[in-house]
Design a protein with these regions (language model features):
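A short acidic, amphipathic alpha-helical/loop segment
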Residues: 17-21, 130-134, 174-175, 207
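Glycan-processing catalytic domains of CAZymes
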Residues: 7, 82, 142-144, 153-173, ...
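Metal-dependent polysaccharide deacetylase catalytic core of the NodB/CE4 family, i.e.
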Residues: 25-133, 149, 154-159, 184-194
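C-terminal domain-boundary segment and adjacent tail
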Residues: 24-26, 110, 141-150, 189-240
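Boundary/entry segment of secreted carbohydrate-active catalytic domains
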Residues: 1-14
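Hydrophobic "anchor" residues on beta-strands that sit immediately upstream
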Residues: 5-6, 79, 217
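Aromatic/hydrophobic pocket-lining residues that form the small-molecule binding cavity
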Residues: 15, 98, 102, 172, ...
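Short beta->alpha connector loops
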Residues: 10-13, 123-127, 165-169
C-alpha cells in the first residue's frame, strides 16, 4: 500500500473546477487558504495583458478567488489549512505579526468550517527556525514548505515538511513509483497553474483517476502525515 496526500494553495476560484474532479474520484485533499485576501463574493478567473498588467498573474492568467460566502460549499468534505491571513511571508515581517497572521487564518477557518484546523503551508515556502518554533507552540502540527524530498517519510521536522513533488513535475509518475518503496507520496500545487487550458485539466484528471483506481493507493490528508512520519521513524520500514 502507498498513502497519497495532496494540497492546493491560495483559495483561487479555479479550485471550484478542481474539487469537482476530486469528488468524482473520491480523492482527499487539503486546501491552504488566506482568508484576508478573499472578498465576500467569488471572483471568477480572468485573463490579463501580461505586458500592461502590473499585478501578479500566471502567464497573464488570474485564478480569481473563492468568496467567503462560498467557502463551505466549495471546500466542504475536504481539509482546510492556514496559509496566513494575507499570504504573509516568514522573515519578511516581525515574527509576532507573522504568528498573528497564521492564527487569524486558523481561527477564521475553524469558525467557518466548525472543524479543527492545525495544518499550515508556508507562504512562498519561506520559514525560519523561530517561526517554526512559534507555530509548533501554537499547536500547528505541520508546516508545508516548497522543498521536495525523495523519501517523504524521512522528514525530520513536520514544521518544515517537504513534499514528493509539484503536481506539474514531468517525472510525476516516476517519483510516485519510487515513493512506493517508502509508502508515502505527497504532491501539491495551485489550480490556477492549469489556467483554462483543456489538456492540462485533462492530464490532471487522468492522474487523479489513475491514483484513485490503483488498488495499492490509499488517499490520506496532509494532517495525517506527521503521525505517519513518527510511526515510520519508530519502526523503520513499516507504515500501517
Amino acid at each position: 500500500m502507498i498513502k497519497v496526500a495532496q494540497c492546493w494553495d491560495d483559495g483561487v476560484a479555479t479550485d471550484i473546477r478542481l474539487v469537482e474532479i476530486l469528488r468524482k474520484y473520491n480523492a482527499k485533499a487539503t486546501f491552504n487558504l488566506c482568508p484576508g485576501t478573499l472578498a465576500e463574493e467569488t471572483v471568477k478567473p480572468f485573463w490579463t495583458d501580461p505586458v500592461l498588467h502590473t499585478g501578479w498573474s500566471h502567464n497573464g492568467f488570474r485564478g480569481g478567488a473563492v468568496g467567503k460566502k462560498d467557502l463551505k460549499a466549495v471546500y466542504s468534505g475536504f481539509q482546510v489549512a492556514s496559509h496566513c491571513w494575507r499570504h504573509e511571508t516568514a522573515g519578511m515581517i516581525p515574527d509576532a505579526d507573522f504568528l498573528k497572521a497564521a492564527l487569524d487564518a486558523r481561527n477564521f477557518l475553524e469558525d467557518v468550517f466548525q472543524q479543527e484546523c492545525r495544518g499550515f503551508a508556508w507562504p512562498c515556502g519561506k520559514h525560519t527556525p523561530e517561526t517554526e518554533r512559534l507555530l509548533a507552540e501554537a499547536g500547528f502540527r505541520y508546516g508545508r514548505t516548497t522543498a521536495n524530498l525523495a523519501d517523504v517519510t524521512a522528514n525530520e521536522n513536520p514544521l518544515a515538511l517537504a513534499s514528493s513533488c509539484h503536481f506539474h513535475n514531468w517525472q510525476f509518475w516516476k517519483i510516485f513509483e519510487e515513493a512506493k518503496k517508502t509508502g508515502v507520496f505527497y504532491f501539491w500545487g495551485h489550480s490556477y497553474e492549469m489556467m483554462e487550458y483543456p489538456p492540462l485539466w485533462e492530464r490532471f484528471e487522468q492522474k487523479i483517476k489513475a491514483l484513485s483506481e490503483d488498488p495499492e493507493v490509499e488517499w490520506v490528508d496532509v494532517i495525517d502525515l506527521p503521525d505517519l512520519l513518527r510511526r515510520n521513524q519508530s519502526a523503520p520500514g513499516t507504515l500501517s
